[in-house]
């Protein structure tokens, strides 16, 4: 029902509508839940359904807000596999996440702290900015902490 509803919103009709729904039901492994009310789906399947609905119309740009929040690690990995497949097919995907290890999958990222963007760049560039004698191979978490501390110092000086 959800996918049919969103297909209608996106203006998909006839054969194209049915093909899109069938393709995404298969892609996201929703076959065994076709007769299940969305409210009754396990969380991971609710997330799959939401992503399937969001891509029914094959958008050029997709915004995902915390797409893997609350799901288990296996489902999280599977979700990123779907996201990466979309990117490989030319879709621009903008993701918000609190999981820095997920941000590593992104080509570019922006770090937001206290409502302001404090840094932007490729994950490797941000990690390199935190490199020091004490931390020769910084993680993205190390970079985030260093950039937050730098921002705090700058705010104190102003």
Residue positions per predicted region:
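Conserved ABC ATPase "signature" region
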Residues: 4, 8-33
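ABC ATPase "signature
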Residues: 120-121
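Hydrophobic anchor residue at the start of the ABC signature
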Residues: 51, 79
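Conserved ABC ATPase signature
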Residues: 37-41
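Catalytic Walker B motif of ABC-type/P-loop ATPase nucleotide-binding domains
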Residues: 62-65
